[in-house]
């Protein structure tokens, strides 16, 4: 689960709208996937794209990325815009937000099922079917194990949360007591 910065979401929306207009969403998504791998490599080396851009000739770095990963012209110009506006540090969040835009466009929602133990594929499939009917769209669920919820489940998707956990019930009970006494 990611809490995204509003700046990253805004940049992702702009990139997505341009990719839709040019009918190159899948190519841009592929470019961003390659850039994500490059950023992971840099992170392992304790470096960031912003740091590399400041150390090297800025144009050479973007040209290197463009040729090494065969980036589309839109992706290349987008990277240059991020660099010009000192927003390269947002790239990983922009990639996540862009993926969310693509999923939304395709009618897919990403959700998280938080449980105290790992659920079976059959159980996840059952709850997925219920919420797909409710949402009227495809749902991709990741099962996250969190022992702190004590028991029950929490289902999160988009901006919604269904908290049916023991911890959630205890906290709701505490809130009611504080309000009434």
From Swiss-Prot:
<comment type="subunit">
    <text>F-type ATPases have 2 components, F(1) - the catalytic core - and F(0) - the membrane proton channel. F(1) has five subunits: alpha(3), beta(3), gamma(1), delta(1), epsilon(1). F(0) has three main subunits: a(1), b(2) and c(10-14). The alpha and beta chains form an alternating ring which encloses part of the gamma chain. F(1) is attached to F(0) by a central stalk formed by the gamma and epsilon chains, while a peripheral stalk is formed by the delta and b chains.</text>
</comment>
<keyword id="KW-0406">Ion transport</keyword>
<dbReference type="InterPro" id="IPR026015">
    <property type="entry name" value="ATP_synth_OSCP/delta_N_sf"/>
</dbReference>
<dbReference type="GO" id="GO:0045259">
    <property type="term" value="C:proton-transporting ATP synthase complex"/>
</dbReference>
<protein>
    <recommendedName>
        <fullName>ATP synthase subunit delta</fullName>
    </recommendedName>
</protein>
<keyword id="KW-0139">CF(1)</keyword>
<dbReference type="InterPro" id="IPR000711">
    <property type="entry name" value="ATPase_OSCP/dsu"/>
</dbReference>
<keyword id="KW-0472">Membrane</keyword>
<comment type="function">
    <text>F(1)F(0) ATP synthase produces ATP from ADP in the presence of a proton or sodium gradient. F-type ATPases consist of two structural domains, F(1) containing the extramembraneous catalytic core and F(0) containing the membrane proton channel, linked together by a central stalk and a peripheral stalk. During catalysis, ATP synthesis in the catalytic domain of F(1) is coupled via a rotary mechanism of the central stalk subunits to proton translocation.</text>
</comment>
<comment type="function">
    <text>This protein is part of the stalk that links CF(0) to CF(1). It either transmits conformational changes from CF(0) to CF(1) or is implicated in proton conduction.</text>
</comment>
<dbReference type="GO" id="GO:0046933">
    <property type="term" value="F:proton-transporting ATP synthase activity, rotational mechanism"/>
</dbReference>
<keyword id="KW-0375">Hydrogen ion transport</keyword>
<keyword id="KW-0066">ATP synthesis</keyword>
<keyword id="KW-0813">Transport</keyword>
<comment type="similarity">
    <text>Belongs to the ATPase delta chain family.</text>
</comment>
<keyword id="KW-1003">Cell membrane</keyword>
<dbReference type="GO" id="GO:0005886">
    <property type="term" value="C:plasma membrane"/>
</dbReference>
<keyword id="KW-0997">Cell inner membrane</keyword>
<dbReference type="Pfam" id="PF00213">
    <property type="entry name" value="OSCP"/>
</dbReference>
């Amino acid at each position: 689960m990611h809490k995204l910065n509003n700046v990253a979401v805004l940049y992702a929306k702009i990139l997505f709208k341009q990719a839709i207009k040019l009918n190159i969403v899948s190519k841009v998504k592929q470019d961003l996937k390659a850039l994500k791998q490059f950023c992971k490599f840099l992170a392992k080396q304790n470096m960031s794209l912003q740091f590399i851009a400041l150390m090297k000739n800025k144009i050479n770095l973007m040209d290197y990325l463009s040729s090494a990963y065969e980036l589309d012209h839109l992706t290349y110009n987008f990277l240059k815009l991020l660099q010009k506006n000192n927003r390269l540090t947002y790239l990983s969040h922009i990639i996540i937000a862009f993926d969310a835009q693509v999923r939304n466009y395709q009618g897919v929602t990403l959700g998280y099922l938080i449980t105290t133990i790992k659920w079976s594929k059959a159980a996840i499939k059952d709850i997925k079917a219920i919420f797909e009917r409710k949402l009227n769209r495809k749902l991709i669920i990741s099962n996250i194990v969190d022992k702190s919820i004590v028991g029950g489940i929490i289902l999160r998707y988009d901006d919604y949360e269904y908290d049916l956990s023991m911890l959630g019930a205890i906290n709701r009970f505490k809130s009611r007591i504080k309000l009434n006494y």
